[in-house]
Amino acid sequence: MVSSSGLIKTIAERLQHYKAENIVVDPVMVATSGSRLLEEDAVDTLKKELLPIATVITPNIPEAEILCGMEIHTEEDMVAAAKAIYEDLGCAVLLKGGHNINDANDLLYTKEEVSWFKGKRINNPNTHGTGCTLSSAIAANLAKGFDLKISVQR
């Protein structure tokens, strides 16, 4: 988790300096309990400095609600939110639906298409770190040369 504006700015500057490719950002902003983890200024810096240089961001529903300023209750809301985030930030959005939408269906929104990845919810109290694991796997697949949709699917 990147928790301060200064750290977010430094990371964005270094990624740009080194011309990093295949940047995958899991914008950790909300704890599993629902508590906000970032101050408002850090969220603003994240939205202005780091997320726009990402290839894809992987927010969960509470994080997407913060990024787009709308409530998400349905799959149609997920599409509208992902579109709003894409249009605001200019990067692909993998909106993870495991929080409060039917089952655990994820939505990939890109310039070219909208893709659904259907999943079944597994009730397990030990889910801490699953979003970070997913974003790391996507980054690894992109680094191997797979396109974004295949990287998410794998």
Predicted regions and their residues:
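Glycine/small-residue-rich loop that forms an oxyanion/phosphate-binding "nest" at active or ligand-binding sites
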Residues: M1-P52
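General structural feature for long, well-ordered alpha-helical segments within catalytic domains
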Residues: S3-I11, A42, L46, T74-A81, ...
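Alpha-helix C-cap/termination motif
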Residues: H17-Y18, E87-D88, K144
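Glycine-rich beta-alpha junction loops
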Residues: M29-A31, G97-H99, R121-N123
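Conserved phosphate/ATP/ADP-binding segment of small-molecule kinases
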Residues: E40-V114
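Short, small-residue alpha-helix embedded
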Residues: I66, N124-L148, V152
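Glycine/charged-rich beta-loop-alpha catalytic/anionic-binding loops adjacent to active sites
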Residues: K111-N123
